[in-house]
Amino acid sequence: MKKQILTLAMLSALVLSAHAQQPANQLLPYQNPTLSAEARANDLLSRLTLEEKTKLMMDASPAISRLGIPQFQWWNEALHGVARNGYATVFPITMHMASSWDDALLYQVFTAVSDEARAKAQVAKKSGNVKRYQSLSFWTPNVNIFRDPRWGRGQETYGEDPYLTTRMGLAVVNGLQGQSFDGKPLAAPGVPASDQSKTPQYVKTLACAKHFAVHSGPEWNRHVFNLENLPARDLWETYLPAFKSLVQDGHVAEVMCAYQRIDGAPCCSNAKFERQILREEWGFKGLITSDCGAVNDFYMPGYHGTAKTATEATAQAVNAGTDLECGSAYRTIPQAVKAGMINEDKVNQSLKRLLVARFKLGDFDKDETVSWTQIPENVIACKAHKDLAEKIAEEGIVLLQNRNQLLPLNRNQKIVVMGPNANDSIMLRGNYSGYPTSSTTILQGIRNYMKGTEVRYVPACTLTRNEVQESRFNLFREGMKATYWNNQEQKGEPVATDVMKTAINLSNGGNTVFAPGVNLTHFSARYEGVLTPDRDEDLTINMGIDDGCRLIVDGDTIVNMRECWGRVAPVIKPLSLKAGKPVKIQVDYTQKEDVAVMQFDILKTSKPTNEQILAEVGDADAVVFVGGISPNLEGEQLEIEEPGFKGGDRTDLELPKAQRQVIAMLHQAGKRVVFVNCSGCAIAMVPETENAEAILQAWYPGERGGEAVAKVLFGEVNPSGKLPVTFYKSVNDLPDFLDYTMKNRTYRYFKGEPLFPFGYGLSYTSFEYGKPTLMQVKSKKRGSKAADYKLMFSLQNTGKREGTEVAQVYIKRMDDVDGPIKSLKAFKRVSLKAGERQMVSIDLPCKSFEGWDAQTNTIRVVPGIYQVFVGGSSADAAKTKIEVKVK
């Protein structure tokens, strides 16, 4: 063995020596942009040491100066706009955009997102120090199936249906990677047509399909969960179709493996999924990245326990096919190779995929060669992109109820706005968001629309409590002194000082420093002041922190979380003040990396009575109650201490009790209520359907959400959104959250009566479907023995105003007793003027009739008698159907 190692070392030295003799003015093969990405990657691989290869397989890949390799950050986010990288256009959350059922518009959105991404990458490149979230690999889209509304990260997905998820996911990938809407390479911008063939076809950005393969909560146990015995039919018909299509039709550059185990093997070391399915069956040529810390889960005490050490975990992941690690375990690659646990050829295979991706981006080439680098900086958060954010926000708002035609409202009415989400700009962004240059809350959107008319705002309650809060920060008569150090230990001379006169609400969003001269990350701060009360008061100290903090009151340490990393649960501590008795407050803050947040206030909490609330409402014609939940309550692995929430997920589906009580009280008092629900998931709002005359599902609508909601409320925009998930009546309608089988889940298998069905959404007009006809046409799929079909039907706007309907096509195989009740296979947005009738044609390719064949263990076109349904929702579609025999 020693002789073998010595021989490899000598060969490596000879290769490096030969390369070193290359003339300085001659391009090396890997530096030549006219060669293929594969040829360049092969050449560069031959020049790298094992230690250098290891560094390049980490998510934060450092520069290797001797070979001119620039630094690269693989971890970047763009679920609904460029995230965590300064100012950017903040589009509505993914679920909101899915509700538009408009993949063509979604493609425009992600073309805009990739424009901003390219412009931002150039800014970072010119700075000479590319940080996390500033490169061109984006871990987007999330094409997991939102199988259970309790999952806190469902807001990142495109809903519960495989077909809708696939259509929307493809639009995202094509927009991000600079491909045409149907997945073909686009002509290089700014390059004459005559020169296109001579120009390397660079990828605009790298998209990533995540989380492969069966992943949708719970958040609290994702690092230990083992999914066992999932039926093959559920796997292939529900959980895998979107991934397969994004690989084969969208040519997605990356796939991210998930945290959990499947049948005992962690997803990031699961050879069945990574090697057999992804690479061998689907032909995936791109790279596989781990989720962050997923490989560490193999060996960390109390987690998966499939490895004893980081070296062993690394060997398992690399050998299975995980090319890139977000984490720290891959630092042990040299030890694993030395121990014979990994063959270096495996390392080379993985690294080649990473290098090919970077060469396709133009990461090694001069800017003048890469046309995407010419996208100007002024596209970032430009007006056109903000208008696009408003457009898709309008299309994704779903009108769930409009009893007695309360909507649309008009400017002449007296409107009172109420509720905890009405004036919350942070809620608009959802999770994994960027930082808008400006945003409009729903309250402000309504006020803007009713200029010249007073619009009163009554908070009435918080999201989860029957109380309202008032800042008492002014009791710091001299403010709070702020001191900053560019280290995490508060050592040495401060780099800045300041005096905080109002509640502290600081973040490094938009690359904003806490004070001039302070680092964006890796710094510390101290805020200190004296409260001077003029009366006895019971208050609370409220803090929102990302990363570590310590709270000291009159010398006593009340909170000590200095070692915390990441967003911590809101800190709320009681504070009793006595008139004339000063209280000294000190807050120490430690910023470790990435996001910095420091929020601090002294709050007076009061509980308004029903009489006080009604007095504020007065004789209003309508109360617009803007409630729901927020990204602080649902999201990725959150520390939450509120009834109904656990670890970022929900334990029930109901609207929080405090809001429910206010809406019921308003109804009992005879007030006409419009309930605007903001959430990333379905809410079981049975009482609200009785106590509110109108209900809008507004999700988390992005930076221009206030304008979009106002336009729908007042009728300037006719709502056309359709639900991408089922709204259930109760959590009791659902199977166990840990059960991944599809039995009684989603509209495809749920046998109960939903509150609002999948695909549902009202309009201010009405539509009527004619009897459909089905025509057999020659299959477009080469070599297919099955036929394609064309479905035709009339659609008429039977109302008094223009509107857009999303016509939905579902199928069911009649003899499939264990199969779906129905499955979405096509949809089309159709805009019609009042009274207009149009013949609508929708293609149903032969793959629409594909399903799992248990006899052959394959997905194939299954012969039989099928019912084909068409309508405005999964429920309405049952009214208009036709049968067809598929051979």
Predicted features and spans:
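Bacterial Sec-dependent N-terminal signal peptides
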Residues: M1-Q26
